[in-house]
């Protein structure tokens, strides 16, 4: 700023004292004298040696002077544009002011995909959403719990799709339904093919109506059947005399027998090997919503291919005004700018030193009318004139200092809702979450309709020998002649206990008696014991209370230690300790204990213990695909500080199951005080 003011003062001084050698810009020629930046060449009167001094360091910026009165408007000049001057030096930094908001910039290029963040915590369970469209068939899940469900209605058969291209040679399929007999062809009979592999054993058919057959002739003795299940011990018969063993007879001719009456259904055979996958059946009707047990978390998948860049997002909200940045480094010297407008006349500067005499130049053309000179002395005050027209707008002043921060304005009205943005690129699937709690066992879905018969497959290769077939139906042969009486045999082992008999008829009703001392709504005493009326409490009867009901929140507790039922339903007296799973008697008397457990995965064997000794056992044999239940109850006489708990006697039968929706519980209460 100080340098520019000095240059303007020198320029004005040259105009005043060197008017004889001044020419208009229109007829001015380029001078050979070089000057500092922003120094216009001009002719000088004196002659001397051309010298160029070194540019001194810029002085400190001076104080801002008062703004002068605008001078009178000059006549329009007709000057020719001068030569383009050298670029000026870098000006001082301006004052920092809050600028106006610029136009929003173009959306930036999509950034590179960032690193996967840390796994977040599991969020709260959301509300169930609306039912979505039916998705594609998924991978068969693990076998769920088989529960008897209500069969749904059979869906209509779907339309047959177009015939696909022939696939690769597959494994032998399940034999299809026999098709209709085709028309007689015209061809040479081919060679008989090799015998195919035996097909898988079909499902057991429904028992047919009893036929009326004729007894056929005895057939050849069949192969010895597989060892059957052990039957019930029969009545001991008379011992016969062992006869001599005869020679084996020759096999007779093959007899043609007639089918006899249908015998009773035989025992279930050995389950056959898993058959080949059959053709895909028609999609069944959607079943009831099940609550399946979530599977184990899968392996982390490979990183997918990089997706295409997304669409530009909507315009963001206006951010807060940033803090003015630090002064940047000096930029490169720019190109020469256009000649600026004529500045205001500056104040008279100090007279400069006399310059050296320059060379005499050629005579110039007569110049144009000079500019208006300095104003003369003040004249006599004249009469006030009429109000003139408003003058032209003055030049803008220098930017002022930054004002104080104003008060926060009132919040503006909400703007209009913007247009809906472009749908973003689908995100990448996150890592599988932790395994959730066991769900409610789902109901068994309905059996789907049979699939369409598949095309006959190509001839397969010879397979390995098959497993032995199921046991044949054992038929009773003709009774042979009684042999001679044999010697008495040794005493046999004791047979297994027989099945429990049917329940007996109910007994006659007993006579109701009212003990002496009984009063309705009050407690009574009998043989030194006090009993409490049903529905009465301690406040009415004066009898103390000791009761608890607890639930197991986690499945499969440890064996040979007390089971810790950790979820409390009622334990106001704190006689049950959930940390140890043990109930401690504080009031001597008769207690009633009951427990209800579930079995899943394996058998369950639970026992009720008193002071380290089992009082009663409960055993349940687990059936695959079902959720079994077992329960037990007992009345126990307890003294003070006696302890009662539930425990699994061994680790082999430890299938005790409990979850959020399937509860295993343990209860007890005092009903008579001794």
Curated annotation (Swiss-Prot):
Alphabetical keyword list: Calcium, Collagen, Extracellular matrix, Hydroxylation, Metal-binding, Repeat, Secreted, Signal
Primary location group: secreted
Residue segments, region Disordered: 49-517
Example of a GO cellular component annotation carried by this entry: extracellular space
Residues holding Ca(2+) 1: 620-621, 627-628
GO MF annotations, alphabetized: extracellular matrix structural constituent conferring tensile strength; metal ion binding
Region annotation Nonhelical region (NC2): where it falls in the sequence: 19-52
Subunit structure: Homotrimer.
Alphabetized PANTHER family for the sequence: COLLAGEN ALPHA-1(XXIII) CHAIN-LIKE ISOFORM X2, SI:CH211-266K2.1
Protein purpose: Type X collagen is a product of hypertrophic chondrocytes and has been localized to presumptive mineralization zones of hyaline cartilage.
Name of this chain's protein: Collagen alpha-1(X) chain
């Amino acid at each position: 700023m100080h340098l520019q003011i000095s240059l303007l003062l020198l320029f004005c001084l040259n105009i005043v004292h060197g008017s004889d050698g001044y020419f208009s810009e229109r007829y001015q020629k380029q001078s050979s004298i070089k000057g500092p930046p922003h120094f216009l060449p001009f002719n000088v009167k004196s002659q001397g040696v051309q010298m160029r001094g070194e540019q001194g360091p810029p002085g400190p910026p001076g104080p801002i002077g008062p703004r002068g009165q605008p001078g009178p408007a000059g006549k329009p000049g007709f000057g020719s544009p001068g030569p383009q001057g050298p670029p000026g030096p870098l000006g001082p930094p301006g004052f920092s002011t809050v600028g106006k908001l610029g136009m929003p910039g173009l959306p930036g290029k999509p950034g590179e995909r960032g690193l996967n963040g840390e796994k977040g915590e599991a969020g709260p369970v959301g509300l169930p959403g609306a039912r979505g469209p039916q998705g594609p068939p998924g991978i068969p899940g693990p076998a769920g719990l088989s529960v008897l469900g209500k069969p749904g209605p059979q869906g209509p058969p779907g339309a047959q799709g177009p015939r696909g291209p022939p696939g690769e040679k597959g494994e032998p399929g399940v034999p299809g339904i026999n098709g209709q007999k085709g028309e007689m062809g015209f061809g040479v009979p081919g060679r008989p093919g090799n015998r195919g592999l035996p097909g898988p054993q079909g499902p057991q058919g429904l028992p047919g109506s009893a036929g009326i057959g004729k007894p056929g002739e005895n057939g050849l003795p069949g192969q010895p059947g597989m060892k059957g299940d052990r039957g019930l011990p029969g009545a001991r018969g008379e011992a016969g005399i062992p006869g001599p063993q005869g020679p084996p007879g020759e096999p007779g001719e093959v007899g043609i027998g007639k089918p006899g009456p249908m015998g009773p259904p035989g025992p279930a055979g050995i389950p056959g090997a898993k058959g080949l996958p059959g053709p895909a059946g028609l999609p069944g009707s959607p079943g009831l919503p099940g609550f399946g047990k979530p599977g184990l978390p899968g392996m982390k998948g490979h990183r997918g291919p990089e997706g295409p860049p997304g669409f530009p997002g909507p315009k963001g909200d206006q951010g807060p005004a940033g803090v003015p940045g630090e002064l940047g480094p000096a930029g490169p010297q720019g190109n020469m700018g256009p000649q600026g407008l004529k500045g205001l006349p500056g104040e008279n500067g100090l007279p400069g030193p006399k310059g050296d005499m320059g060379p005499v130049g050629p005579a110039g053309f007569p110049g144009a009318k000079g500019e208006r000179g300095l104003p003369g002395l003040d004249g006599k005050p004249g009469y006030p004139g009429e109000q003139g027209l408003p003058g032209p707008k003055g030049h803008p002043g220098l930017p002022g200092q930054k004002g104080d921060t104003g008060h926060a304005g009132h919040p503006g009205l909400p703007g209009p809702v913007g247009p809906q943005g472009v749908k973003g690129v689908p995100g990448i699937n996150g890592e599988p979450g932790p395994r959730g709690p066991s769900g409610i066992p789902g109901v068994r879905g309905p059996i789907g309709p049979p699939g369409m018969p598949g095309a006959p497959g190509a001839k397969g290769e010879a397979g390995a020998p098959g497993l032995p077939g199921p046991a044949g139906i054992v038929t009773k042969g003709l009774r042979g002649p009684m042999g001679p009486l044999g010697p008495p045999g040794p005493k046999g082992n004791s047979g297994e206990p027989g099945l429990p008999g049917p329940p007996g008829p109910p007994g006659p009703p007993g006579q109701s008696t009212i003990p002496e001392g009984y009063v309705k709504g009050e407690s009574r005493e009998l043989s030194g014991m006090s009993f409490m009326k049903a529905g009465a409490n301690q406040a009415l009867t004066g009898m103390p209370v000791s009761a608890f009901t607890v639930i197991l929140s986690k499945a499969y507790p440890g064996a040979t230690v007390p089971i810790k039922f950790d979820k409390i339903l009622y334990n106001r007296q704190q006689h049950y300790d959930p940390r140890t799973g043990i109930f401690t008697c504080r009031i001597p008397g008769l207690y009633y204990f009951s427990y209800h457990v579930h079995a899943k995965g394996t058998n369950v064997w639970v026992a009720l213990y008193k002071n380290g000794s089992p009082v009663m056992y409960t055993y349940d044999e687990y059936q695959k695909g079902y959720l079994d239940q077992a329960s037990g109850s007992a009345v126990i006489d307890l003294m003070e500080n006696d302890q009662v708990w539930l425990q699994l006697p061994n680790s082999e039968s430890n299938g005790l199951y409990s979850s959020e929706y399937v509860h295993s519980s343990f209860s007890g209460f005092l009903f008579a005080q001794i």
